[in-house]
């Protein structure tokens, strides 16, 4: 029977899916005074882990989070004023919150290799935004025996996971791919990925199971 592999930094508890970690997150040192800003925007739950890593405590600051998992991480960290985006694609989320950020001084905690045009859209829209690189995805070297066998179904959760999978294992034309979103799908242009309707790991897994 074909196997489903989740290529992601986020693991699933679903025992029918193999977790494959080809990337790891490194948090970067920075200093920031949250009280200098009117809002915090985040496109990953790693933003809150980066705040914790740097010993920065939550304050009564509105947070604009890209999706439910990101909003949950904000709440768990200690923020209470949280706007959860209706759009889980970076570019669409930027356009959604742009009118809400006009006239505000905004902080954006981002990854080193952000795949979307999120920051550029807000900047061109006239938002006063300060971007801080708070974390980065680095290659997690894997042994070749971990390479998925032929005809496996691979779920990719980000563009960097595609690149790091290729660095570790190369590619097999028999693989079937599922992408969590549009930007990741572009990175999979050498295959024909199915794009999940919902930018959520569980939704991707449900889609993968329809292919078994």
What are the roles of these predicted feature ranges?
Residues 1-212:
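Signature of uroporphyrinogen-III synthase
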């Amino acid at each position: 029977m074909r196997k489903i592999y989740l290529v992601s930094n986020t693991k699933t508890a679903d025992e029918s899916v193999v977790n494959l970690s080809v990337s790891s997150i490194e948090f970067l040192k920075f200093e920031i005074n949250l009280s200098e800003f009117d809002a915090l925007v985040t496109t990953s739950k790693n933003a809150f882990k980066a705040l914790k890593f740097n010993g920065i405590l939550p304050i009564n600051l509105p947070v604009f989070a890209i999706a439910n998992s990101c909003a949950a991480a904000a709440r768990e960290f200690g923020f209470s004023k949280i706007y959860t985006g209706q759009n889980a694609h970076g570019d669409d989320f930027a356009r959604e919150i742009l009118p809400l950020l006009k006239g505000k001084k905004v902080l954006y905690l981002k990854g080193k290799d952000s795949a979307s045009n999120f920051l550029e859209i807000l900047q061109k829209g006239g938002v006063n935004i300060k971007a801080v690189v708070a974390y980065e995805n680095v290659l997690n070297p894997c042994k070749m025996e971990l390479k998925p066998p032929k005809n496996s179904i691979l779920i990719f959760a980000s563009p960097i996971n595609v690149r790091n999978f290729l660095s570790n294992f190369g590619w097999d034309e028999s693989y079937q791919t599922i992408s969590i979103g549009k930007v990741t799908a572009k990175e999979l242009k050498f295959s024909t990925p199915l794009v999940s309707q919902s930018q959520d790991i569980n939704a991707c897994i449900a889609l993968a199971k329809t292919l078994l």
